[in-house]
Amino acid sequence: MMEPEEYRERGKEMVDYICQYLTTVRERRVTPDVRPGYLRAQLPESAPMEPDSWDSIFGDIERIIMPGVVHWQSPHMHAYYPALTSWPSLLGDMLADAINCLGFTWASSPACTELEMNVMDWLAKMLGLPEHFLHHHPGSQGGGVLQSTVSESTLIALLAARKNKILEMKASEPEADESFLNARLVAYASDQAHSSVEKAGLISLVKMKFLPVDENFSLRGEALQKAIKEDRERGLVPIFVCATLGTTGVCAFDCLSELGPICAREGLWLHIDAAYAGTAFLCPEFRGFLKGIEYADSFTFNPSKWMMVHFDCTGFWVKDKYKLQQTFSVDPVYLRHADSGVATDFMHWQIPLSRRFRSIKLWFVIRSFGVKNLQAHVRHGTEMAKYFESLVRNDPFFEIPAKRHLGLVVFRLKGPNCLTESVLKEIAKAGRLFLIPATIQDKLIIRFTVTSQFTTRDDILRDWNLIQDAATLILSQHCTSQPSPQGANLILQTRGPRALAKEMSFPSVNGAGDDPAHSRKIVMQPPRVGASPVSRHLETLLDPLDDCFSEEAPDVTEHKLSSFLFSYLSVQNKRKAVRSLSCNSVPVSAQKQLTTEGSVKNGSSSRVRIFSRFPEEVMMLKKSAFKKLIKFYSVPNFPECSSQCGLQLPCCPLQAMV
C-alpha cells in the first residue's frame, strides 16, 4: 500500500513522465497500430489478490497503455475538434481530485459553488455574452454553470423548454395528460447540427426536425419560419430551436440575427451550441457571429476543446434560471440546508446530483494565461489553418468545397469520393497524422483541424507533404488500374508526339485559370489551316460531346493542359472512368525513394507532373478532333512513366516526351 512519502516520490516521478510525454508527443505515432481486443491478452484474467509494486504498475504504462493511445495532444492530430490541456489545467485537477468534494449544494462545499459562479461570470464577460447570463448583475435572473459536455447541456436546455411549454399548455388545458401534450411538441435544428441534438430529441421524446441550410451551410430565418408555419397548421407546437455556431462538419454558423427575432415572436426557446467556436469569441474580431445573441435563452461551449482546459469542462448559461430549476428541482429532506432559500444549489441546474470541482482548473487557466494570451492562442491556431488552406489551394489536384472558418479546413481530392476515401485510408496506415472524413452535399471531404497550441508551420508543411504523397500514390494506382483504349491504333505512329504536340494549345479566357465557372468557354477551335493525318482519323470517330463545346474562337492566351482538364472535367462532370489526372514521370519503384529524399526533407511535394512538360503551341485540329484530346480515359504505360494520365487516343504516342 502506498504511504504519503512514497506518494510524494511517485508523484514527482509521474509529473516528470507527464512532462516528458507532452513535450515529445509530436515524435510518437498519432494513432495506435492495434486491433480491437489487443489489451485482453496482456492482462490477467482476474484482479491480483496481493498488491503489485508501483514499479510494475508504472512500467505497464508504456508496455500496455501507450500502444493503444490516440495522442490527442500531438500537433499532428487533426481529427475531430481540439481536446487541449495545459500545465495550469493539470495542476487544477490535481488539487480538485485531492479535495474530491461533491458540490451538489452550497452547503456540501461552499467554495465549489461560489468559485464556479464567479468564474462563469468572468467567462461570460470574456466572450462578450449578454448581461442577462451573469449571476451577479442587477436585474439578471440568469447565470452560468459547468456541465460535463455540450451534449448534456443541449438535453438540459430542451428539457427546460419542454417543461416550460407544457406548463403553459396546461394553463389552458388543465385536464390534458402531459404525455398527450408532449406528443404535440416539435423542435428544430439545422441539418448540419451535431448528433447530440438528435439524441436530445430521442431522450426527451420531442420531435426534432432538421432544416435545410443555405449555400454556406447556415440555417436561415426563412427556412425556420416556413417549418413553424407548416407545423402549426398540422396542430403541432414548436418549442425549441438549436442554433449552431461552428458546425462539426465544416464549422458553419447559423444566422442568429434572423433566427432570434423569429424565436422571440413565436415563443420558442433559442439554444446556442458553440461547442468549438465559443472559444474564438475571446477575440473581438470573431464576435460578428454572435450578432443576435441577445435573443438566446441558453448558450453553451466547451473550454475543454480549444481553451486549454482539459476534459470535462463545459460552460452553460441560461437567461432565466427559474425555468431551469423548475425542471430539475427535487427536495428530499437529506439535501436541505439552512441557506436553501438564499444560496445557489447547482443540483437544480443539472441532471446528476453530484458534481466535480471543475471550476478550479478553469480558474487556474484564466489566471495563468490571462485574456491576452488566450486570445493569442486562438489567433495562432487560426493563422496555422490559413497557412494550410493556402497550401491546399495551390495544388490543382485538391479542392476546398466549403469556406474555412477559424481552425478548420475541409478539402478533398478532385474526382469521385472513392479517391478521397482511399487517400484517408492510405494516411491512416502509417498513423503519422490523424484525419477524419465528413460529407457535404454528397461529397466526401477531409477535415483538417489545427488542434495543438504547439503547432508550427513546419508541422503543417510536414503533414501536407504526407497528404500529397498519399494522394500521389492513390492517383497513380487509380490511373494504372484502368484499361488502355482500344482505339489507340487510330493514331499514326509515323507522326511523332513532339510533332503532334507542336500543334496543341489550350487557351484560357480572361485569366480564368482553374476556375470551373469559366471552363465551359475555354475549349475553342482556332481557324483551320490544314488537315493532318491525325486530325483526319480523329474526325471519323463519333463525337458524343458536341453539345459541351463552344463555337467561339477569340484570341486568348495559352493555358496548360492540366489546369484546363481539371477545370473542364469539374464543370462537365465527366468522371466515370479514370478519376484522376495525376501523372508521374518517375517509375513506381522509384517513388518511395523520391518521397523520402524529396518531399519530407526539403518541404516540397514529390509529385512530378508530366502536364508541366506539355508544349503550349497552337493546335490546328478541328473541333471534333480536339475533343478527342480530352476524353477521360487512361493511356498505356510509358517506359519512364509507370503512372498514367487522363488523355485518350492522342496521348498514346507521347512516350517520347518523357
Swiss-Prot record:
Modified positions (N6-(pyridoxal phosphate)lysine) in chain numbering: 305
Key words, A-Z: Catecholamine biosynthesis, Decarboxylase, Lyase, Pyridoxal phosphate
GO-annotated molecular function: histidine decarboxylase activity; pyridoxal phosphate binding
Binding site for substrate: 81, 194
E.C. number: 4.1.1.22
Classification via SUPFAM superfamilies: PLP-dependent transferases
Cofactor(s), by name: pyridoxal 5'-phosphate
Keyword Lyase: yes
Catalytic activity: L-histidine + H(+) = histamine + CO2
Gene Ontology process terms (BP): catecholamine biosynthetic process; histamine biosynthetic process; L-histidine catabolic process
The keyword NAD is assigned to this record: no
Cellular-component GO terms for this entry: cytoplasm
Classification via Pfam families: Pyridoxal_deC
Pathway: Amine and polyamine biosynthesis; histamine biosynthesis; histamine from L-histidine: step 1/1
Assembly mode: Homodimer.
Family statement drawn from the similarity comment of this UniProt entry: Belongs to the group II decarboxylase family.
Purpose: Catalyzes the biosynthesis of histamine from histidine.
Name of the protein this chain belongs to: Histidine decarboxylase
Organism: Bos taurus (Bovine)
Lineage per the UniProt record: Eukaryota, Metazoa, Chordata, Craniata, Vertebrata
